[in-house]
Amino acid sequence: DSVGSTTAHKQQNINHLLDK
């Protein structure tokens, strides 16, 4: 699902920012 991929991408981006 495109929506699922987008959500996963956003979540990964947030995780990256949090890790920083």
From Swiss-Prot:
List where in the cell it is found: Secreted, Extracellular space
Q: Which domain of life is it from?
A: Eukaryota
According to UniProt, the tissues expressing it are described as:
Hemolymph.
Where does the record place the region Disordered? 1-20
What keyword terms does UniProt attach to this protein?
Copper, Oxygen transport, Secreted, Transport
Q: Which GO terms describe its cellular component?
A: extracellular region
Query: Where is this protein chiefly located?
Result: secreted
Tell me if Kinase is a UniProt keyword of this record.
Answer: no
Question: What are the protein's GO molecular function terms?
Answer: oxygen carrier activity
Q: Which family does it belong to?
A: Belongs to the tyrosinase family. Hemocyanin subfamily.
What is the annotated role of this protein in its UniProt record? Hemocyanins are copper-containing oxygen carriers occurring freely dissolved in the hemolymph of many mollusks and arthropods.
- Complex formation: Composed of 3 major subunits (IB, II and III) and 1 minor subunit (IA) which form homohexamers and heterohexamers. May also form larger structures.
> What name has this protein been given in UniProt?
Hemocyanin subunit Ib
Species per Swiss-Prot/TrEMBL record: Panulirus japonicus (Japanese spiny lobster)
